Amino acid sequence: DMARWMGMDPAEKKDIAWNASSKRFMQGWYDKVLRPMERDGIDFWWLDWQQWDNDKEFPRLSNVWWINYTTFTDMERHHDTRPMLYHRWGGLGNHRYQIGFSGDAIISWKSLDFQPYYNSTASNVLYGYWSHDIGGHMGADSINPEMYIRWMQFGAFSPILRTHSTKNAGLNKEPWVFADKERDIIRDIIKQRYSLAPYIYTMARHAYDTGVSLCRPMYYDYPDAQEAYTNRNEYMFGDNYLVYPITQPMNNGVSLQKVWLPAGNDWYELTSGTMLKGGQTVERRFLLDEYPIYVKAGSIIPQYGDVKNLRRNDEAVTVTVYPGNADAEFVMYEDNGNDKQYATAYASTLLSATHSSEGTLRVSIGARKGEYSGMPAHRQYRLKLVASAVPEKVVVDGKQTDFEYDGNNLSLMVDIPETDCSKAKTIEVVYAKDAPVLTDGLIGK
């Protein structure tokens, strides 16, 4: 079909020269080659240097830049869903179209060590959606489980999490090819990533509206601190998480990591349950299933529970509140997830937490504002208070209710009956006046 479209005889089996600057060639490529496969169920395309650097007729036209643009806009014209494609960096301004992938990464600690810096500083040219070959692509015939787990931990707090490698049976990365302990760690990393989807999606909307990427260097948030420029591999993951991936092998089963914690607020260490003061550099120890993730004190994070996929947006949402003395809020964003009306058709829910001098924490789940196609009318919520003492009582909309307390993880859970999303919910957690805040690193102890 493509040969006939180009005025050639298919029986001659002649090559058709790539010519991205030819409107006829590109129209034929999309309509005769790609479109039939899209009708068979292909949702997005991964383009990968199937052409030379620059166009033959217009030498100053970058083939990568141009094909990213033409593929994105072709999908935009011919599909009801949002365009999506993977391709390489095409130059300044090309961030508008493709999700980038950073090439065939060498399997080495050195390669892993470079990626966090590379990932976050790309935000300086608005290139906020890098994806990487998690675990590395080539340069080895077998997987180092420790290195792969550290790479996965970084990947879970990257814009895109995907594993990839060259065709080599020794480099298979399915969780079940690992030993039980390693498999369980990998599974928990993936589940953690899924659980953060409401938070990540909200921050993705922020990036769309402001140009500030999900992953960005520390100097975006702390421009006056010298440490924000010298800690190259440390970055913010959205507004609430500070991440410093481990990129070196353990010594005697432990990784030592120095982490700079900016002044202005305290930081809750996710793996240990320790609250650390801001304005200092700390050296912390981490086992293989632990890594440096810090949450701003008092943060509210919307999360999913144990979801299997992200096809639906009506999943139960856990409102996780981290310890902190200041009042806090988070505006959770939602839209259809796949249609093209997201610019104007979306909804938001204000989540807030306020403290009273009498020892009561009041958490509010606001009435949802806005609307979009497929929006669920009702939703199940769960409140999770991290580092919480056992309360005297919990009251939901004026009625005392049951709660669960996890003594191992020092957390309080309150299940809220399925609620009309157009109506606000208020949860009051009443503590004794001398109730402690359990941020001394005893989680799991």
Report the location of each language-model feature.
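Beta-strand-connecting loop/turn residues
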Residues: 239-240, 272, 359-361, 408-410
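Catalytic-domain carbohydrate-binding cleft regions of carbohydrate-active enzymes
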Residues: 1-290, 295-296, 338
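Solvent-exposed beta-strand/loop surfaces of large extracellular or lumenal domains
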Residues: 269-288, 393-415
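N-terminal, helix-rich and Lys/Arg-enriched segments in bacterial and organellar proteins
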Residues: 34, 44-49, 86, 92, ...
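Accessory, solvent-exposed terminal regions and/or long lumenal/extracellular loops of proteins
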Residues: 293, 297-399, 416-423, 431-445
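Generic beta-strand structural signal
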Residues: 236-237, 355-358, 405
